Amino acid sequence: PKVARTIVRLMAKPDDEKGLIHAHSYAIADRLRELLDEFGVSGRVRGHDSDNRDAALSGWKRSDDPDVFVSVKMEEALDLAGDLCRWQVLCKAPYPNTNDSRVARRLEDGQWNWYYRTALRTVIQACGRVVRAPEDHGATYLADSSLLDLFGRARSDMPPWFERQVDRLERPDLPAFDPGRAGGAESDSASRNRPNRGSDTRSIEDHPLSDVWGDG
């Protein structure tokens, strides 16, 4: 619920800009959409399942509405330059799935540095989705303290430019939790693209992490 409430607060900002949520798994994405529906803001929320992923993404990108797209596994190869997206949320540290036998075998061999390094690489890729050029701008928000823990564990593997941005982490001044200000009531846009699974400064200030925070 804490992550969903944070998303509602971001949606209540007066900018009316598109946002992207990196949910990391379909289970997290489904739960977030359920909570956002309960909060009454589902009219501004879009999502996808494994079958309509590309179509749902294309529809969101084409839309002029300030909708929020709840995504799964979209940390790489996604170009959201300019007004296509101005803010994004990382819900948790994207560690490899330990139920994968290959991952489990590596950890049995003590390859924990690989485990943390892989998650860090995914975070770095995700941070580059909304800032695509020196003159572009966007904000990345960290919604869970597991990301801060990852930064501590993988510090030695950080590129210098990323480490500088991590050192500049700060907590943003967000509006109070008020679904009414966030818009997206069901009457505004009845369950638009809301799938349920099974059915369907030219300087450091413009860096992807120039407005990042951790809520521990």
Name every feature range the model reports, one short phrase each:
Residues 1-216:
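ASCE RecA-like P-loop NTPase motor cores
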